[in-house]
Every structure is written in structure tokens, then in C-alpha cells.
């Protein structure tokens, strides 16, 4: 219900304008050094209020670890952590407390639960994704132990698409742009949306790779039927607010190709292409895992919109508040965290795949 993962399980709680949001990460092996600098940096990457291209709401996003860590290392017990909400402005939503905001979750949440938490969307707010980023930082600490790195960036804003992918540039870019040559045009598209009291959609690219040059990813992460790696990746990404489509490898373009064009041919040195995006038969094949995540435009726009109230009466909705003009930007960081969580979960699952692995653990002496 509120949990992601099987062997590494993240459960989250809290609402956008509540006192705090939090999570419990269960299944983290003991003995992993907690990198507090990494944790803080990941939270800052997702943080709003850093420039005009994100929401003006700037939370401190300090992660308070309450359990599961002893003397700087994971203890093997559930890691509990909290993030306090300090910049919420519920009054911005007073005028729409009985209205349904178009393309928001207000309508479905109200009909499912019978409760209208109008304060920034309550549980359905993207504020909850801060917990996923914190948990993703812990997952990255685990993956680092086996030489796996996840990274992300923006490849498309509206119709302006990157032609080159530079993940190092994305780390320095205000909008996490992968293509320096297209960055200004992408920024202009966002600024034009802001001027018109509108928003704009975008596409994030997330990849997992070996930490060292020419280092491959582990082969066999995932299972062939009911725990397919690509299915778990898609499930995690689609569970994030605003995501409308997920592609792995060539994705939808695959349906336009012939087998002779799509197949990843092999040599003694390995695969000659990576149209599969690093996944075959539901399992990692050692190549880079390539994921594209498509975000819809932010539904919170500052234009009059036609809607209904909780009694079904037609009315006009004019929003206030602080909102991202393009949720894909900060969403890319969350997707990177989600891929880290999925891969860490699959690494732990893989320990059960061969008896040799268990013998290594239990027959050391």
C-alpha cells in the first residue's frame, strides 16, 4: 500500500503540509558506512527554491535518522528517518478547499477515501518524494559496495530534445540538462510557460552503469517471470507523481523496428549494441540500464480553469501557491533514487538464485 520493494523495503508516511514526512527502510545489510555527505547532497539536488525553474517552496530537507545506524554504520535493523515540513503555507489553498483541481488527484482521493485534504494535495503531493530520495541515498551506499552507479538528467523539455548526453554537465545544470547545446532553448521553453501562467512537460533519462571505466553491471539481477527487472523499474517509476510513461532501452521505438535492426548482436567482447537497455528476459545483462521517464505538465497552473466542487457544481478554479513549472526537473532526481532502490532490492534478491551463494555465506569455515 505504502511500501516499495521486497527484500529492501521502503515504507513512507506523511502529508505535504503535515508536521513531517518520514520513512522506514527495512532490509539494509549491516556494516555499510553511512555517507552523510552523500545523503545531504542528494536532498539538495531535489530541493526546491534554488532557481526560477523549480517551486519557490524551499524546505531545509534535513534528514533525521532515528534508528538503524550505530557508530556510523548500518546496523542491519530498520533505518527510520524523518524530514520536518517547515515551509508549508496551507492558507494558499483556502480558496480551493471544496474544489477539485483539474488533473490533480483531488477528485480520485476524495471519492476513494471521502476526505478532502486540500493542503497542498496531502498524501498525493510530490512532497512525499523527498523520502524516496533519502532512501535512494541509502540504496546508493549499498550499490557503491559492488561498483554500481545510478545517474540522471533531462533529455527533453516540451519539444526540445537533447542530441548529446553528458551526465557530468547535468550535475552542474540548473535544470539538469544533459545537452549543453540545447539547455538554453529548454530554459526558454520553461520561462515562456511561466510567463503565460502555464507549465510544461519533460522527459528524464536515468541510467545505471559500472562505477569504473569498462566495468559491467552484475548479470542476472531480477527474475524471469514475476520479479522482472524491467517490470519492477516501470512499477517504481510509474508510482511517482506525474509520470505517464516509462521506456527501457529503445522503448516505444522498438515497435517500429525489424528484428534485424533491433537485436543486440554479440561477440566475444560482449554486446555490440544496447537496444534492450540492459535488460533481457527480465534480468540485467551486464550492459548499462537505460530508462526514460515521461512527465506530464505540472497540473497546477495559474490560469482560470473549469472544474466542479465536492457537490458536483460547476465552477472556476484559480490556483495560488508555489509550484514547479516543470516537474520533470526535480523528478529526474527522484527517478534516479527509485532506480537505485530497485537495483539494491534486486541485488539482495539475487543472493537466493544459486546454492553457491549460500554456501559462500554459511560454509566459510
Swiss-Prot record:
Pathway where it operates: Metabolic intermediate biosynthesis; chorismate biosynthesis; chorismate from D-erythrose 4-phosphate and phosphoenolpyruvate: step 7/7
EC number: 4.2.3.5
Top EC category: lyase
Swiss-Prot/TrEMBL catalytic activity: 5-O-(1-carboxyvinyl)-3-phosphoshikimate = chorismate + phosphate
Superkingdom of the source species: Bacteria
UniProt binding sites for NADP(+): 46
Signal peptide, first to last residue: none
Biological process per Gene Ontology, one example term: amino acid biosynthetic process
Cofactor: FMNH2
PROSITE patterns: CHORISMATE_SYNTHASE_1, CHORISMATE_SYNTHASE_2, CHORISMATE_SYNTHASE_3
Keywords of this entry: Amino-acid biosynthesis, Aromatic amino acid biosynthesis, FAD, Flavoprotein, FMN, Lyase, NADP
Subunit comment: Homotetramer.
Function of the protein: This reaction introduces a second double bond into the aromatic ring system.
Similarity comment: Belongs to the chorismate synthase family.
Name of this protein: Chorismate synthase
Amino acid at each position: 500500500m505504502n511500501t516499495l520493494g521486497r527484500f529492501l523495503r521502503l515504507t513512507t508516511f506523511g502529508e505535504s503540509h503535515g508536521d513531517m514526512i518520514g520513512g522506514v527502510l527495512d532490509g539494509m545489510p549491516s556494516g555499510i558506512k553511512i555517507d552523510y555527505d552523500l545523503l545531504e547532497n542528494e536532498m539538495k539536488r531535489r530541493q526546491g527554491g534554488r532557481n526560477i525553474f523549480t517551486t519557490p517552496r524551499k524546505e531545509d530537507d534535513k534528514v533525521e535518522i532515528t534508528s538503524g545506524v550505530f557508530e556510523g554504520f548500518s546496523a542491519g535493523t530498520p533505518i527510520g528517518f524523518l524530514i520536518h515540513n517547515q515551509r508549508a503555507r496551507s492558507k494558499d489553498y483556502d480558496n480551493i478547499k471544496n474544489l477539485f483541481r483539474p488533473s490533480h488527484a483531488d477528485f480520485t482521493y476524495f471519492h476513494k477515501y471521502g476526505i478532502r485534504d486540500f493542503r497542498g494535495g496531502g498524501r498525493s503531493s510530490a512532497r512525499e518524494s523527498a523520502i524516496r530520495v533519502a532512501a535512494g541515498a541509502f540504496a546508493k551506499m549499498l550499490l557503491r559496495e559492488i561498483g554500481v552507479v545510478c545517474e540522471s538528467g533531462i533529455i527533453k523539455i516540451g519539444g526540445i530534445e537533447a542530441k548529446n548526453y553528458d551526465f557530468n554537465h547535468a550535475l552542474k545544470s540548473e535544470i539538469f540538462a544533459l545537452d549543453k547545446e540545447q539547455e538554453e532553448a529548454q530554459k526558454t521553453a520553461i520561462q515562456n510557460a511561466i510567463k503565460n501562467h502555464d507549465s510544461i512537460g519533460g522527459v528524464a533519462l536515468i541510467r545505471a552503469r559500472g562505477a569504473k571505466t569498462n566495468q559491467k553491471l552484475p548479470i542476472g539481477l531480477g527474475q524471469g517471470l514475476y520479479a522482472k527487472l524491467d517490470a519492477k523499474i516501470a512499477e517504481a517509476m510509474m508510482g511517482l507523481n506525474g509520470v505517464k510513461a516509462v521506456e527501457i532501452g529503445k522503448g516505444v521505438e522498438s515497435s517500429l523496428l525489424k528484428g534485424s535492426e533491433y537485436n543486440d548482436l554479440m561477440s566475444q567482447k560482449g554486446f555490440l549494441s544496447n537496444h534492450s537497455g540492459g535488460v533481457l528476459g527480465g534480468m540485467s545483462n551486464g550492459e548499462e540500464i537505460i530508462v526514460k521517464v515521461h512527465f506530464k505538465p505540472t497540473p497546477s497552473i495559474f490560469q482560470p480553469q473549469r472544474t466542479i466542487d465536492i457537490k458536483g457544481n460547476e465552477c472556476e478554479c484559480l490556483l495560488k501557491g508555489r509550484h514547479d513549472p516543470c516537474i520533470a526537473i526535480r523528478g529526474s532526481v527522484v527517478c534516479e533514487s527509485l532506480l537505485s532502490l530497485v537495483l539494491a532490492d534486486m541485488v539482495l534478491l539475487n543472493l537466493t538464485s544459486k546454492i553457491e551463494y549460500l554456501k559462500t555465506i554459511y560454509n566459510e569455515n
